[in-house]
Every structure is written in structure tokens, then in C-alpha cells.
Amino acid sequence: EMVIRDWSSDVCSSDLTLEQVYADTFHTEACLVRPQITCGTHALAIALFGNLRPGDELLSPVGKPYDTLEEVIGIRPSNGSLAEYGVKYRQVDLLEDGTFDYENIRKAVNEKTKLVTIQRSKGYQTRPSFSVKQIGELISFVKKIKPDVICMVDNCYGEFVDTIEPSDVGADIMVGSLIKNPGGGLAPIGGYIAGRKDCVENASYRMTCPGLGMEVGATLGVNRSLYQGFFLAPMITKGALKGAVFAANIYEKLGFPVVPNSTEPRQDIIQAVTLGTPEGLV
């Protein structure tokens, strides 16, 4: 069967090469890297909607996700959420010490659990961010309960902080934003979805539309910045880590609670400082 499409809308070789560079770097079967993905929340929404269907259940074994994902999932009512499409959501909060509640995670996984979403970074919370090793242990635990469950890792703020990524420890999908670590400060827009080929393809049908997927999408001249940013990303991430350690040292000495502290190992580039009052911020 011959499929004829407007040549001007087809993906150029520069796109495909960039995606292969990402896939090779992250050791995955496939990767979707596009400027049409506007931010990390958008990338996560594409991955979730692309791989979940009505009647499926989504499980977060790491507590509440980012505020922006609450409306995507339907934790807070919003138009077009996963909840509106019949996807149910379960959540298992972390234990008081910030570790995984394996007992209740085991109870939460059931025959309808289609996808488990794991947020690597603390985000706006004060819990510790998770190491790749911890994420691998959680994925292994979940897969023993339900081998066919899709394990997705929100890798925002975590790329290149460690020598390995969640895709190296069993993640089926790994999602991130190019306006954070992998963009190296040069990417003006974009996101990536890396992982199993079928999962990435499913996400691509949500990014564009069924039947087209990753075969279309103009780059509007930003690919050069995406390539250069990805090349510089490890160095830029290193600089961000140095800045975070420096900030932790300063605020610690001023008496403010900080997470992580100035000597703890770092799993992302986020530095939390508890100022205590609105006036403290000013």
C-alpha cells in the first residue's frame, strides 16, 4: 500500500539523527525529541495519554506528583484530564523517612494497574530526591508483582547528575524537558520521551495524531540549538550542581533548613531552602 504525504511536513534526517543520539545516550530502543513538546508537564501528559486507555489504572508509588500534573491526572478537576477519559488514579505516599512504602505499594498494584509513574526529583517538596539505584529497586519490586506493567520515570532535573539513568535500571519510559538539564541552557523549547519502542510510538500518536505519530513535525530551525545544548548538557548540569552546593552552604550557615544539605549526595539539580516566612523571601 502506497502512502502519499505532503513532503514539506515530513520529518527531516536532522530530527531522526537527534532522536537516535538521545536513544544511544540513554540506551533505549527509541526516543521522541521534538520542539512541539513545550515543557516537562506536556511531555509527561503525552506519555500518559499515549499509553493509558479507559478502564486502566495509573499508580504513583512516590506520593503526590508535581502540582501541574494534578490537573493532567484529574486529582484536581480539569477539562480533558485522564480522569475524564476513564483512567483511575491511585497513590501510595512515602514513609515518614522519605522511603518507599513497599507494603502498601504491593497492595495497590492490581490487574488494572497499567502504568506506574515515578517522579525522580523532589520538585517543590522537601523530601529527598531518589537515586537511580533506588528507582531501579522500586521498578524491580513492581515488575515482580506485575511483569507487564509500564514503569515510567519523570526524569526532569535529573539527567546527567549520575553516571546512569533510569533507562539503565528497567524504566520502560523516561520523560524529560529540554528547557532543563538536557537542553544545556541553549534549547529554547522541547521535550523527550525515551524508552521501549512501542511505548514511544504510542506517545507519538498523542503528540501529533494516530497514523502520523513521529513521521511529521517541523523543527523551525531550532535543531542546531538542541544538538549543541545536548552536547553541553553534562557540563552545564555540573555547573548547576556546583551552584546548588554553594547555595546550600550559604543558607545552612545562615540557619535555614536546606534539602539536600551541603554534604549529601545529589540526585538532581534542585536545591530546597525553607525560608519560613514570606518576608524571608523578600
Write out the residue ranges for each language-model feature:
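Intrinsically disordered, low-complexity boundary segments flanking structured domains
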Residues: E1, L18-Q20, I75-S81
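Single conserved hydrophobic/aromatic residue that forms the stacking wall/gate
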Residues: E1-W7, V11
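Ordered hydrophobic segments in well-structured contexts
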Residues: V3, A30-V33, I270-A272
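N-terminal glycine-rich, Lys/His-bearing helix-loop that initiates the first secondary-structure elements
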Residues: R5, S14, K242
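Conserved PLP-enzyme active-site core in the AAT-like
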Residues: D10, A30-C31, T38-G243, A248-Y251, ...
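Long amphipathic N-terminal alpha/beta scaffold segment
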Residues: S14-C31, A43
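Conserved C-terminal alpha-helix-loop-beta "cap" of PLP-dependent enzymes
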Residues: E252-V282
